Structure formats: structure tokens, C-alpha cells
């Protein structure tokens, strides 16, 4: 089948890039032709929607007594070629992608199926146009399969949608041939708001094995010592810094990182003045960080996922701002909920507590077969 994938934009997010790489790889191995329909940095908007967006931006800025930033996407676009050059190269070399997709101009005749997912495609705050994630552009298409694979709401509660938006999404969801979600909490959300049954499946990255990721990253060698702690932290704060210092001191580990010094190119002047320190390292380096590390400390969902894939002992500090439902759903599958720690309980945790990987890997294989069956049953 000729399949188009709708997911979050493929820019710098390592987990977002690799979940799409994994889903494409899996679908290709199942015999399909696959392309990811990537969104542009500057969104395709009608004049009316653009004016509405500008008005809302102004109102929010006045309410918060801030100078409004009208064109954040244009700021990112200006520096895009530099700060995303490594991640963009990985995408171009490893993912079949249509860049700057204007979804309204896609043709029905070019596709046999559309797959939405994975990642937080149904989390409104991360979607420029939530209708795209429910295939509104294809609502009148015929002879097309509409599938959601491991779609995520990001949280376990319904939020950030007005009643009319919910009705709009429900009408579009009714057209889907099959739905699956990445978190168990998504099953209830689909039933409550869309009146649709959804299956709980694995994040696409877990459909591949460590060897698959080593195959695309082994050409990059990291000179990391034997006793190392890979610190993949998205939201650095005093708590995460204190936790890293505590873990390294107690276990005698050397911390290392795979993130730029500056990550906010829009509002941070220093980031724009120091582009080398704002550039995201290669995806291959990120993968090799897991392969090389003795232990992983993270507040990232996919940081947790890849720790499991590479069978590395790990500790997760809860990231409530980004959504704890994802972590709880993932770790409950494997009985690893005790790997989530809070700053308050860190001092009382035995950081040398091992993980028995044999049952974890057996569970992952069972879920992998279940998830693959969802794809094979619904894409034929």
C-alpha cells in the first residue's frame, strides 16, 4: 500500500524523529511504500486564521504585560539551517519525507492509506492545526484507509480544546478505520470524546531493536569512559541539577550530555549570538549515548524508552509539565514504576537497584507482536 504518515514536525526532537524512522522502517518491512508528510516551519494558514492568530497573540501579550512575539516561526526559520543541520541530515538520509507539506493540496489518488502517529499528535498545545492530526484535509477522500497508530494525547485528562473543537475532532475520528493509542489513558479519552474503541500499542521506537539503531549510528564513536551517566534532561532546573550531582557523587559516575547549551532560539539573545552552542548534536550521537552509558538519568519519555531498548539501568525524574501519563503508562507495562523518582525521595533510593531485563524483554516482545498485528490487520 502507498501510505502517508502524519506526525509531529521532524526538526530537532530525537524521540520524535526516531519514532517516525521506526514506524517507516516497520511499514516498509511489511511491504508498504511510505512517506512522511512533514509540516512546514512557517504554517500554511488562510488570511483569516492568520489574522485571528495575531489578534490572540496580542491579547495574550497584553494580559501578561509582555511585548508580543508575532513571528516566532520566522525567527526559527532564520536559524533553521544551522541549529538543525545534524538532525535534518539524519532525516534526509534515513526517512522518506515530503517537506513543507500543504495538506490541502495532497491528492486522494496518491495514497491507499493515511497513518496518524505516533507521538503527541492529539495534544492540542503541540498542534498548529489539530484538524490535520484527524485528517480533516482528507475528510472527503474515498477508497482510503485512515489509521491512528500509537497516537498520544500526552496527558490522562482532556484539555485545551473548546467544545466546538471536540465536536470537530469527533466527526473526523468517526471516519477512522482503526485507532490505537500510546497510553492506556487514551483508550478512555477516545471512548468518552469520540465514542471510538482504541487499542493500546507500543511506541513505534519499540518495534525495532537496539541493533537496528546501532546500524544507523555505529559509524559515530563516542570517547566515553567506563563509568558514565548519560544525562538527557529536557527541562533543566535546580532539582534536576541537584539530582545529577547526587547520583554522580554516590555512584562515582561521570556525567555527559547530548543537548545544546541553548535551546530557546526565539527568546534567548545569547542563543542567537552563539549558534554553535545552540546546534543540536547528531541523532547518531544521541543513540550512541545510550549504547555507551553505564546508566541513564532523564526526564524524557523517549529517553526512558531508549534506556529500555538498550537495557540500560535508568532513573526518571518526573516531568509533570510535559505529561506524566506517558511515563506511567510506559513503565507500568514493564513493572518498572519504581524507576520514577522525585527530588524529595532521591536520597532514600538505592541507586544500585538492578533491573532484571529478561522479563522486561519478554514483555516487550509480546507487546511488539500485538502492535505489529494491529498494523498488519488494518493495512491490507
PLM region spans:
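Nucleotide-sugar donor-binding and catalytic loop/hinge architecture
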Residues: 1, 110, 139-143, 214-228
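Aromatic- and Gly/Pro-rich donor/ligand-binding loops
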Residues: 5-14, 18-171
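Catalytic donor nucleotide-activated moiety binding site of glycosyltransferases and closely related
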Residues: 147-154, 187-190, 240-280, 342-348
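Acidic anion/phosphate-binding donor-loop and adjacent secondary structure
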Residues: 157-161, 206-220
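Leloir-type glycosyltransferase catalytic cores
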Residues: 276, 332-380
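A donor-sugar binding/catalytic signature common to diverse glycosyltransferases
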Residues: 289-329
